[in-house]
Structures are given as C-alpha cells and as structure tokens.
Amino acid sequence: ETNVIAGESGGITQHIGAYEVEVKDKKITFIDTPGHEAFTAMRARGAQVTDIVILIVAADDGLMPQTIEAIDHAKAASVPIIIAINKIDKPGADPDKIKNQLSDKNILVEDWGGKIQCAHISAKKGTGIDDLLDKILLEAEVLTLKAPKKCLAKGMVLESRLDKGLGPVGTVIIQQGTLKKGQIFVCGSQYSKVRDLLNERGESVDFAFPSDPVQILGFEKVPVSGESFVIYDEERDAKKISLERSRLEREAIHQMHSKITLDQISEEIKSGKASELNILIKGDVDGSIEALSDSLMNLSNDEVKVNIILKSVGMVNQNDIRLASASKAIVICFNVSSSVLGRKLSRELGVDIKHYSIIYEAIEEIRLALEGLLKPDIIEESVGTAEVRDLFKIPKIGMIAGCHINKGKVIRNSKLRLLREGEVIYEGHLTSLKRFKDDANEVLEGYECGIGIDNFKEFEVNDIIEVYENKEVKRKLK
C-alpha cells in the first residue's frame, strides 16, 4: 500500500505497468491502463482483461478530455467503474463539482442517487486509500469475481518488449489456471515453451496464478499487446493451432481491411451477428449534437437499436477512430471535418466517416438503413379460386379434380386451401395442373382444368380451392 501511495513501485513494476497489493488477506492487481491504452487495444480483440476500472479524477481540475475519453473506453468495454476523486487536500478541491460533471456523462455516484462507488483520496498524503481499497474489495465481492486454478492457464498479453539479454518478453496477466515453467503455449500465431517466469520484482518464480502479472520468457518473437496466451497439454495441438493462425495471418495480409460501413453493419444485423448500430457523433456545437443524438436514439425499436457510443464537439481525431474501430461503429460528422491523422487512421482501420450539414439528411439515411433491417410483414394475397365439378382417376397420378376457374387464376406449385361447405379441410400445394391431357403452368379465369394436390385425394364435387401466395411487405419505423 505504501508503494501505491508513494508511487515507489520499482523499475520492473513501472515498466510492466502492473503491480499487486495485499489487502485483508486478499490480493488486488492494478494495471496501469493509461500507460498502454489497454481499453481500446484489448476491446478491439474482444477481450476484457480488467474486472473493475478505477477512474481517478483530480478534485481541482475537473473532468479533463482524457478523463472523458477514459469513461468512453470503459463503457465500450462494459467494465464497472469506481470513481476516485484525488487531491482532496488541495485548497481548490471541489468533489461535488466533479460529481456534477460526472452526472452529465451518466456517471451517478452513490451519494447522488446512483450505484457507482466513489472514494475521496489524496494519493500524496495517503488519505482515503484504505477506503478505496475496501470499495474495490466490495465491488469484487458483488461481482463474485472468481477464477479456477486447477486447469490449464489462460491469460492476456499486457505489453511486450525485446530485451537484449532475455530476448522477446511478454508481460501476461493470468486470467485462469496455474502457469508453470516448461509448459507449451500458443500466443497469437506462435507456439513455444515457457522458459522462465519473472514476477513484478523481476524474480524467477515457478508458478503464476489467476490475476498474477508475470513476465514470460520463451517467445519466438515479440508478442502483440492484447493477444491471448493459452497453455496446451500436447505440443501437436499447439502446433496445429499455430499453423492455422499463421495461415489466416498470411491471408489477411493480402486482403484489404474489412471496412466498417453502414452496409456491412446492416448485413451483420441481418445475419444475427449484431443487434445494434453503434454510432460515434462529432459536431460543431452541443445543441446540434444533442438534437441529432436524440433523434437517432428515437429510431430504436425492439428489433434494432441505435447506440451512441460517443458524442462530442470538435474534429474527428485518432482516439475517435480507435474507439469506433473497437466498437464497430460508424462516425457521423455534423458540420465538422476530420484531422489529417484521423483520416489516415480511418483508412488504415477501415472506419466509415459520414459527413452531413443538414440534420434531417443524417437522420433519414440512418432511418432507411434501419428500416432495411426490419423483418418484413408477411401478407396473404389471393391468386384465384376454382370449383370442383367432376372427379377423374388417372393411372400413376391418382385422383384429379376437374375444376372451373371462377376467379383470378391458378398456378402450379402455388399454396392452396380446400374448403367444403365454407370450412377449411386441407391446406397444401397445387402439384399437378392440366389442360386436357397437357401439363400447364397456369390456367386463367373462365377455363377448365384438372388439379392435383399433394397428399390429398378425397375431393368432392362443389369443393372450393383457394389459391394464394404470401408476399413480403417492407416495414417502416414508427
């Protein structure tokens, strides 16, 4: 705890950006996420390495742009938040001002009627640190954070480096299982054997357990931050997975980035791979942004949902593009442009940026896209009716109804229902249609024909055959 307060975490801890604290016989592992942008990078790979986010806000500064950005990243990663208002010992400290600013971002702390815990601390003097640690333990207890130890280890690469003496080194946080020296692992497209394990103090250890940050030696190449680290019993299994991932990587190199466009997201929603349309809005003034955001949110219904992951004033920058890429969102610019670096990164990551100067055009384009995702209404449309006037038995076919077309037409393979004295006694398909001895595709009103129905031969004179078809009608948002 003293190290946390004073920042004296040691060279190794500062380097790997992770350290452990013992509190009431329980262990808390802190990951220095701002240092290596864990939220966006790991969210982009579908991972959730953090269980709880501690959002530290300076009591004398208020919400800074990077704090607001951190809130957006935490929400995008769906990780619970605990607020730590720091520097409460300073003369200009105003915790209530901070809480009010947080409420504007839909972050309501407990004493403001919300569910988010908040601690008042001074990292410099150590004030409130015990309370913050207690709140972390309470949140962990509510979330029932547990991980199995008696299984093969899995983890996530926090960061990596090429050490002159040690070679490729990956800092991994263990998420489940027990990691041992000598085990076979797969990380990204490489597989190898754990040569050594170093704890946060740089000491060699034989084991690493869930929530332990550990430096792993034995990589063939420097691993990528955010990659999964998985132990396998059999080397042949690890090798097989490694070869397959290598093949996929080679294919990806020869393909363009999968562009995150409105059409692509629409296809994912249609196929059931997604149920939300994520949108990031950038605009020139707050009023326009709020109006556009509210209008787009109102387009949501039970089938498709518009989710605004970020709305802010200003040009589109690189952080906006990273968040959009991680969340599979499109970017809407209202009366603003994109920075040069933002445009460059959007091309690299394949993020779609759409520009508008008229609010109704933006709303209408999103509305049309969402309407295209709605399942169509199915309506029944009558094609024709026929009256049974005679019965014929034809070799190899069976009973055929000699009919007169009273209305419309009848079409081979159409859906039909057979009525007798006003009651439906059978529903099926028109499988045989003849004019005299010849097969016919359709017979029009006023003509006579022979009709055969699948799995039905019990015709009676005066039966009525109704032929119909089901048509899809495009729905509109209400």
Task: Name every feature range the model reports, one short phrase each.
Residues 1-235, 239, 278-282, 286-298, ...:
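P-loop/Walker A NTP-binding module and the surrounding RecA-like catalytic core of P-loop NTPases
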Residues 139, 257-273, 277, 398-399:
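Phosphate-interacting basic helix/loop segments used at nucleotide- and nucleic-acid interfaces
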Residues 238-265, 269, 371, 378:
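Charge-rich, low-complexity alpha-helical coiled-coil segments
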